[in-house]
Amino acid sequence: MRVTWDPAKAAENLRNHRVDLAQAASVLDDPLAIRMEDPAHDEPRFLALGATLAGQILVVVYAYADNEDLRLISAREASRAERRRYAEARR
């Protein structure tokens, strides 16, 4: 399964959240990531709260593309409460 993203959306995400989607993609490989559905949208979207390879705790929003690839939509640094939730889940 490949992870893809729109280059324009990646540039916007970097401007708005200072998070590179290429680095954020590694959250999806975190075996301890907390995954959940994001019901706030018309299309099925999912959230992953986890760590990048560099140890940065992020929230990544993604969807499944028609060809089964994952399409990253956005990523941002986790809030204090989200970081706490991730740390507690790791115990």
Task: Describe the residue ranges of each PLM region.
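Ribonuclease/tRNase effector modules and their secretory precursors
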Residues: 1-91
